[in-house]
Amino acid sequence: MLDVIFREYDIRGLYGKELNEKSVKAIGFCLGQTMLNKGCKNVSVGYDARYSANELFNYLVSGLNKAGIKIYDIGLVPTPLGYFSLYEGLKFDANVMITGSHNPKDYNGFKITINKESFFGVELKEFSKEVYKHLDDDIEENLEVEKYDILSLYVKFMCEQFSFLKDFNYKFGVDCTNGAAGVVIEPLIKALNLKAHVMFAEPDGQFSNHAPDPTEEENLSAIREFLNQNQDYSLAFAFDGDADRMVALSKTHVFCGDELCYLFAKNIPNPRILGEVKCSKNLFDEVAKFGTIFMGKTGHSNIKKMMKEKDIDLAAEVSGHIFFKHRYFGYDDGIYAFLRALELVYKGFDLESMIRALPKLYTTPEIKISVNEEEKFKLVEEFQKEIEKGALKGVKSLCEIDGARIDFGDGWALLRASNTSPYLITRFEATSLERAKELESMVFTLFDDIKARFKN
């Protein structure tokens, strides 16, 4: 039953079912041992606004204490503040954030960083075997921690980094989605004396106003309505549940992560940029005119790894994860990205006009295909083989860095396996909507043939 909680990038499951006293105490104990074995002397632990956070914190801390590692409680804070705690202040050796990110309210999980490296992939799978061995251990409640105020340190750091924004006479909206963002946004806005209309700042684990995923159009309706009703507000920002993602929107446009990446790149000298495999052709074509750009795998852990390997200044996912190494520490931080977006406005960048000036491309929404967990990677491999054999007309090139991204010259198609769920994910982009739909039809016809063969 616990197999499902150990994902590619983190640990995630239903509170009370997969994430219960027995499993979380065992996770804490095994994590403490792993951290000690990697030379860590301490760990910071924080959590988001979910109703299950306190109980999971107690279970996790009890396990960590049994392992014998020093624990610092950084409280209810966004995930980026957990990462930040490894770089500033006491500069902790490891961090665990208890967060369900953008998932429904009954979910929760753990994002783990050890010695500034994401704990994921093969290591996390091997770790799961250790957890199984200790599921029946008698781990007593031990809540011994030392409190640490990372929030004040973070706000002070941001105020110093963005001191030029103080008293900036520009009105904008912010939707904190009743997640963890509000605990930072409110003191930050106050300290910089910014003219912001802040919505849903109160942390509420029930997410009473809307779900904590700003990439879903329905979750932007409240902040969009505010923009439309107030002529002197032209831009707004929305965060996900743990504020490692940010979406910007105007009265007429939602800026996706790849569009934001392009805008940010224009403000970096000779930039080295990384875009995930789902990013628009515009990002790769346009950045190549003034910088260097790479394509990489989806997933925050994969991106952080490649950023180090390629000395990347800035990376992005379409979903709103923005990673700044330029003037920052190289992890995804929605609040930092929000401040960098305000910086663009402060410098006179017209964000909407800059995006409108790009070549017009038509992108389909992400389509998920439900498949068996055991078959998903095999199906993608078979699809890649068929492309290599010439199964589709007009193929210019095939990129297999993460699934199959097929370039047709006037558009591209993507089929990749989700690393976290039993789905294949598709995306299509072309110079016309008709062509994008045509590519979609071609890919689905081929995939249906492959899937039928698997059943026989």
Predicted features by range, described:
Residues 1-67, 144-170:
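An N-terminal, well-structured beta->alpha segment
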Residues 40-48, 171-173, 272-277, 313:
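Short glycine-rich phosphate-binding loop at a beta-alpha junction
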Residues 42-107, 188-248:
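N-terminal small/polar loop signature for handling phosphorylated ligands or for N-terminal nucleophile
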Residues 92-105, 227-254, 294, 300-333:
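Glycine-rich phosphate-binding loop
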Residues 108-229:
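Gly/Ser/Thr-enriched, mixed-charge loops and adjacent short helices
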Residues 270-427, 433-456:
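Phosphate-binding and adjacent anionic-ligand microenvironments
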